[in-house]
Amino acid sequence: MPRSLKKGPFIDLHLLKKVETAVEVKDKKPIKTWSRRSTIFPEMVGLTIAVHNGRQHVPVYVTEDMVGHKLGEFAATRTYRGHAADKKAKR
């Protein structure tokens, strides 16, 4: 369910400050964050943000198409390894 338009997009303040300083200094190092719930803003385009997936930080290079989406959408938390093979099919 999308967020109400009257509330506006959400971004954690600590992440916003890190993004602003990275843009000011023109720093290309990945910004580590645990904030998967933050919305991607236009200021983030061109930056690499390392989003935590519960186990490690996944580097996400932000493009213009990603604006408006959440950071967590681009760092998968579950790995699907397929269903167990059927014993009858192996014979």
Curated annotation (Swiss-Prot):
Keywords: Ribonucleoprotein, Ribosomal protein, RNA-binding, rRNA-binding
Database matches in InterPro entries: Ribosomal_uS19, Ribosomal_uS19_bac-type, Ribosomal_uS19_CS, Ribosomal_uS19_SF
Keyword rRNA-binding assigned: yes
Keyword Acyltransferase: no
Gene Ontology CC terms: cytoplasm; small ribosomal subunit
GO BP: ribosomal small subunit assembly; translation
Gene3D superfamilies reported in the protein's UniProt record: 30s Ribosomal Protein S19, Chain A
Pfam family, one: Ribosomal_S19
SUPFAM superfamilies on file: Ribosomal protein S19 (SSF54570)
GO molecular function: rRNA binding; structural constituent of ribosome
Similarity comment text for this entry: Belongs to the universal ribosomal protein uS19 family.
Biological role: Protein S19 forms a complex with S13 that binds strongly to the 16S ribosomal RNA.
PANTHER family: RIBOSOMAL PROTEIN S19P FAMILY MEMBER, SMALL RIBOSOMAL SUBUNIT PROTEIN US19M
Full protein name: Small ribosomal subunit protein uS19
Organism encoding this protein: Hahella chejuensis (strain KCTC 2396)
